[in-house]
UniProtKB/Swiss-Prot annotation:
Protein localization: Secreted
Disulphide bond pairs: C50-C65, C57-C70, C64-C77
Alphabetical list of SUPFAM superfamilies matching this protein: omega toxin-like
Main location: secreted
Domain of life: Eukaryota
The keyword Secreted appears for this protein: yes
UniProt-listed PROSITE patterns: HWTX_1
Annotated tissue distribution: Expressed by the venom gland.
Name of the protein in question: Mu-theraphotoxin-Hhn2m
MF term (GO), any: ion channel inhibitor activity
Signal peptide boundaries: 1-21
Function in brief: Lethal neurotoxin. Selectively blocks tetrodotoxin-sensitive voltage-gated sodium channels (Nav). Does not affect tetrodotoxin-resistant voltage-gated sodium channels or calcium channels.
Length: 83
């Protein structure tokens, strides 16, 4: 009875350690992925020579890329859905 309790406790400790180690690796992965996504997005914006979604703009100057357009109300590039 004591041996089975010891094995169960040892198994739980091992499970906790493995879970904690994998969780710490998973926390670094999304940060790394987001930094790569934003780095690529910034590079594409510089390459195009136009402003992307969420960038400030002046209405009527056509500074935004073809898909996002400059909002007259908010003065930033946004995507218009519909008409």
């Amino acid at each position: 009875m004591k041996a089975s309790m010891f094995l169960a406790l040892a198994g739980l400790v091992l499970l906790f350690v493995v879970g904690y180690a994998s969780e710490s690796e998973e926390k670094e992965f999304p940060i790394e992925l987001l930094s790569k996504i934003f780095a690529v997005d910034v590079f594409k914006g510089e390459e195009r020579g136009c402003k992307g979604f969420g960038d400030s703009c002046t209405p009527g100057k056509n500074e935004c890329c073809p898909n996002p357009a400059c909002s007259n109300k908010h003065k930033w590039c946004k995507v218009y859905l519909g008409k």
